[in-house]
């Protein structure tokens, strides 16, 4: 870590384990450092989400996701389809690495990952030099926040708000299985 990072408020909060809300391609998301178990647990508590469900990681590029993915276990027949869909709003369930944190993968042998085209997400991932947890900014049973005001109404001052514009998608990312190609979520 170089000295110029010490005055980056986002990076300081990220490294301190804070949870933040930020615009994604379609809705506001909640994020944190995927390697910080306390931060992920705080995010899950805010969302009222069970850890067993797992979470999505979003990166600036596939290289950022490699520590969490067992790249050698991705079927050769699926690689072109997966990698040609990025950057973009498609999340893939890929085989998890042996070191992928259980608080991110839940009870699955797979990990949900996406390479984003959203300029703000790309910037945040570049500044952190790693992926972010990315899950919709809402609590169980409520629709995802579509504005900074909605984020504030859901979470008050419990998250750090990074304001910005949503991307052009009308719904959260499609989720597909990296082995079967089956669509798991098609909003």
Curated annotation (Swiss-Prot):
Region called Disordered, residue ranges: 168-187
Keyword Glycoprotein carried by entry: no
Enzyme category, top tier: transferase
Stored PROSITE patterns: YRDC (PS51163)
UniProt keyword list: ATP-binding, Cytoplasm, Nucleotide-binding, Nucleotidyltransferase, Transferase, tRNA processing
SUPFAM superfamilies with a match to the protein in the record: YrdC/RibB
Disulphide bridges, residue numbers: none
Domain YrdC-like, chain residue ranges per copy: 4-187
Family: Belongs to the SUA5 family. TsaC subfamily.
Domain of life, per lineage: Bacteria
Protein name per the record: Threonylcarbamoyl-AMP synthase
Subcellular locations according to the entry: Cytoplasm
Species: Pseudoalteromonas atlantica (strain T6c / ATCC BAA-1087)
E.C. no: 2.7.7.87
GO cellular component, one term: cytoplasm
Gene: tsaC
Protein's job: Required for the formation of a threonylcarbamoyl group on adenosine at position 37 (t(6)A37) in tRNAs that read codons beginning with adenine. Catalyzes the conversion of L-threonine, HCO(3)(-)/CO(2) and ATP to give threonylcarbamoyl-AMP (TC-AMP) as the acyladenylate intermediate, with the release of diphosphate.
